[in-house]
């Protein structure tokens, strides 16, 4: 689905690699959008996000798997790119816990320690994996 060879695709690839947060928007029971920043890893095909099991985003995904994600408009290098993904979210019961995923630990170990938690404690607290497969991407660079 993603062409990483175009100018837009290269910007997407850069953001997937370098951004610390992505904004996840779910839809609540009243049909209202509910955005929140989340930690993520991109596995080449989908976003993987970890959540506390009773978080609203988990309930929202179970009731309506249609979600969107977007990056902040300006990245750390000052680039002003707009990238918005639409996708299908699901609870991934087969995902390894966060502390057993090298890519997740490379990216967020310092942040986890900043929460006064060990990686294993983080994985126990944020034990629900949400996988999001993009169905559409739009924006401009």
Predicted regions: what they are:
Residues 45, 78-79:
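A solvent-exposed, acidic/Ser-Thr-rich amphipathic alpha-helical stretch
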Residues 1-22:
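Short, basic/aromatic recognition patches
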Residues 55-57, 76:
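Short, surface-exposed beta-strand-loop junctions and turns on beta-sheet-rich folds
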Residues 16-17, 62-63, 123:
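Alpha-helix boundary recognition
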């Amino acid at each position: 689905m993603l062409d990483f060879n175009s100018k837009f695709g290269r910007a997407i690839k850069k953001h997937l690699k370098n951004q610390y947060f992505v904004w996840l928007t779910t839809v609540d029971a009243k049909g209202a959008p509910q955005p929140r920043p989340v930690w993520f890893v991109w596995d080449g095909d989908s976003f993987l996000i970890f959540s506390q099991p009773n978080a609203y985003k988990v309930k929202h995904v179970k009731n309506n798997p249609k979600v969107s994600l977007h990056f902040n408009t300006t990245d750390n290098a000052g680039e002003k790119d707009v990238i918005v993904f639409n996708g299908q979210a699901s609870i991934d019961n087969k995902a390894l816990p966060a502390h057993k995923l090298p890519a997740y630990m490379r990216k967020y170990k310092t942040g986890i320690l900043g929460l006064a938690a060990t990686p294993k404690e983080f994985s126990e607290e944020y034990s629900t994996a949400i996988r999001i497969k993009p169905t559409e991407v739009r924006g401009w660079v």
